[in-house]
Amino acid sequence: MSANGTAAAAPPHSLLASGVPLAGRYLVRERLGRGSAAEVFRAADLEGGPDVAVKIAAAGGRKQHQRIRNEAAVLARFSHPSIVSLVDQGVVEVSGSHAGRPYLVEELALGASFAEVIRAERPGAGDVALWARGLFGALAHLHAGGLVHRDIKPANLMLSGLRRSPVRIIDFGTAAATRSAPEPGISSGTVHYMSPEQASGGTVAPSWDVYSMGLVLLELLTGTKAFPGTAIESLVARTLRSPDVPEYLGDWVPLLRSLTAMDPTERPTAGEAAAMAARLIPGVPSARRGMPAVRGRADPGPCPAGGALPFRRHRQQA
């Protein structure tokens, strides 16, 4: 999509220009995003279902194709109100520039990404607490299943447009097993949101996601990145200190400081963080906010967020 909201022009022989339904079912309407790993399209379900997001591997080789297959495998295994749901998957058989590429069909989130929320306005602390409860609940479910997302950042967190579960985590292409070793020559994550140990190439751990989510929440609440500057400046800064958490954030300060502790053993689990975030939601009776946080295995059960949110137009990231 272009900046003014009009559909980007489709290259000749592309799936968008062909007018031929993908798998005989999904009629591509517009391109929503394009990145180095994939293109994302909005498509109509000709069998009467709601519109969906179609994610097709970018041209370029094995790495891009493997990310799509990896994401499909993760989404097929995990179901949670705050994890985007998988609808279908396959390989593009329509002739043209997309032929032979793997694709997946996902639930279409109808809201903005957190990256767009940060650019547009600073959301209320109550809304952020509501979102955090759902997102940490989703991470707890993922971690209990032995996986780590590895690329938690504003562009990979979406508003769904739904009241009962208003947030979604997307893009599981670089998810990896807990305690696995980094692949030589394969980078994961986004520099400005990596934990210090992820940036140094340590063993994959759930604490990576917890730290990254802490930086995202801090940015939502303050409007600025915790570690600005170039990639190198950002990486060096986090190896020397924890991010600054302004005192004006009040009750958020203890949570944010624990999430972004330099020592990963001092961070809460995602399940504990979900309970801590729930206690920051205004107007929610204490009995509904969850029990006090207790150290232990992340809770794999659903933790749906609730409450009404402003409707925003979807712009999914590739």
Predicted regions and their residues:
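Activation segment signature within eukaryotic-like protein kinase domains
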Residues: W131-A132
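Protein kinase glycine-rich loop
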Residues: V28-G35, V40
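Short beta-strand micro-motifs within the conserved protein kinase catalytic domain, predominantly
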Residues: S85-G100
